Curated annotation (Swiss-Prot):
Protein's job: Binds directly to 16S ribosomal RNA.
Protein name as it appears in the record: Small ribosomal subunit protein bS20
Keyword Ribosomal protein among UniProt keywords: yes
GO molecular function (one): structural constituent of ribosome
Any Gene Ontology biological process: translation
Length: 87
């Protein structure tokens, strides 16, 4: 454990940020999984609805720095391609 006051404060802040980031990351993954589940079921309407709910969440996490913008773009591109294949 840290002895210096500022180091103790940073440890507390880091733990708080870690928990917040874990929560946001989990939420984002849940939205992505909903899209994959709809694709697996072969339901294009449900997949589009889930994708439209997921897209702003992923974009927001990229802007906030939780994930890289290229990772957000990759998720969206891959899911869009899979949804378009459903016909």
């Amino acid at each position: 454990m840290a002895n210096i006051k500022s180091a103790k404060k940073r440890a507390v802040q880091s733990e708080k940020a870690r928990k917040h980031n874990a929560s946001r990351r989990s939420m984002m993954r849940t939205f992505i999984k909903k899209v994959y589940a709809a694709i697996e079921a072969g339901d294009k309407a449900a997949a589009l609805k889930a994708f439209n709910e997921m897209q702003p969440i992923v974009d927001r996490q990229a802007v906030k720095g939780l994930i890289h913008k290229n990772k957000a773009a990759r998720h969206k591109a891959n899911l869009t391609a899979q949804i378009n294949k459903l016909a």
